[in-house]
Regions:
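Soluble catalytic domains of membrane acyltransferases
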Residues: 2-9, 14-175, 229-231, 240-309
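Long, charge-rich alpha-helical interaction segments
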Residues: 182-214
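Short His/Asp/Glu-rich catalytic/ion-coordination signatures at enzyme active sites or charged loops
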Residues: 179
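Transmembrane alpha-helical segments and their cytosolic interface motifs
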Residues: 218-237
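Compositionally biased, charge-rich terminal segments
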Residues: 1, 45, 63, 205-222
Length: 309
């Protein structure tokens, strides 16, 4: 089930983004990992990381997303663990200590854990001040005797809220038990974040957008233009309807891209079913079922056509 869902989401991400430039070679495969990532685009960040590494993982997510009981049940089913900030009150903050223990328990059981090191997600490029979550979990795990590496992960988007955006993923030099000598907790947390910040910024320097390799140049785009236009016409009504709904649901939040992707992912089979039903009503009979392989293929061709030489 997990593998099927992971494959489906990864395929959908490849259609949603114009290009995913992923270099995850430094992450051990297999192996239990504590992944410490920057956080530019809410839940979409978790999907990108989880679908580009083979490890099964759970995620630390902002606690306010768990306020709705139904949402909380769904998020926990997706192996998400709530974490809270000081601004949400001391009672909530105490729950975060329990969340760190839960993350440590998952690591010891063999499941990798993804932590967003900045804590707060903001739709902006660059690296913000790091929180202490990743450092605290690492300290807890290492003190317990587990030899689990911390993998710095860098995520960067070419732009936000636009179709076919570029995104880059990188994994950096591992932070291993023993890299930081035994220290008092405050010194350890500060030293850990100093090392993590340096390695995240090293990865950021390797990202360059707009340099997509073109194959065939202008002639290739000429050949792709007719099916790409078909892909645009077949998908535009569905896409813009879902986009308008997403804008209404996420007004004033940073969840636009995440909710848009989620709604597109869930509603796409319904859109294909509607197109199939339309074909049957028009008397196309068996030909109508070609919607299922052909229409997604035209979307893929539209994505490729947009890569200008």
């Amino acid at each position: 089930m997990y593998r099927a869902l992971r494959f489906s989401v990864r395929t959908a991400l490849r259609l949603y983004f114009g290009r995913i430039d992923a270099d995850m070679r430094s992450a051990p495969r297999p192996g239990t990992l504590l992944l410490a990532c920057n956080h530019p685009n809410s839940f979409l960040d978790a999907l990108l990381v989880a679908t580009h590494l083979p490890q099964r993982m759970c995620f630390l997510a902002r606690g306010d997303a768990f306020r709705n009981p139904i949402a909380a049940m769904l998020l926990r089913a997706l192996y998400m663990i709530p974490v809270y900030r000081m601004s949400e009150g001391r009672a909530r903050l105490r729950q975060t200590t329990k969340s760190f223990r839960s993350a440590n328990k998952e690591l010891l059981s063999g499941r990798s854990v993804l932590v967003f090191a900045e804590g707060l997600s903001v739709n902006q490029p660059g690296l913000r001040p790091l929180g202490k979550g990743a450092a605290r979990i690492a300290a807890m795990t290492w003190k317990g005797g587990a030899d689990i590496a911390v993998v710095p992960v860098w995520l960067e988007y070419g732009r936000f809220h636009q179709p076919f955006a570029e995104v880059a993923l990188r994994t950096g030099t591992l932070i291993e038990n023993g890299v930081l000598s035994a220290q008092a907790e405050a010194l350890f947390l500060r030293g850990f974040n100093t090392v993590l910040r340096r390695r995240l910024l090293e990865m950021a320097e390797t990202v360059s957008f707009g340099q997509v390799p073109a194959h065939g140049g202008a002639f290739r785009r000429f050949l792709l233009a007719p099916p790409a236009l078909a892909g645009l016409l077949l998908h535009a009504p569905w896409y813009f309807a879902v986009r308008l709904l997403t804008a209404a649901l996420t007004r004033g939040t940073i969840f636009f891209d995440s909710v848009l992707f989620g709604l597109l992912f869930l509603s796409y089979p319904l859109w294909l079913l509607l197109l199939t039903a339309t074909g049957l009503l028009l008397g196309l009979q068996g030909w109508a079922w070609l919607v299922w392989p052909v229409v997604p293929f035209t979307l893929w061709l539209l994505n490729r056509w947009r890569r200008k030489p």
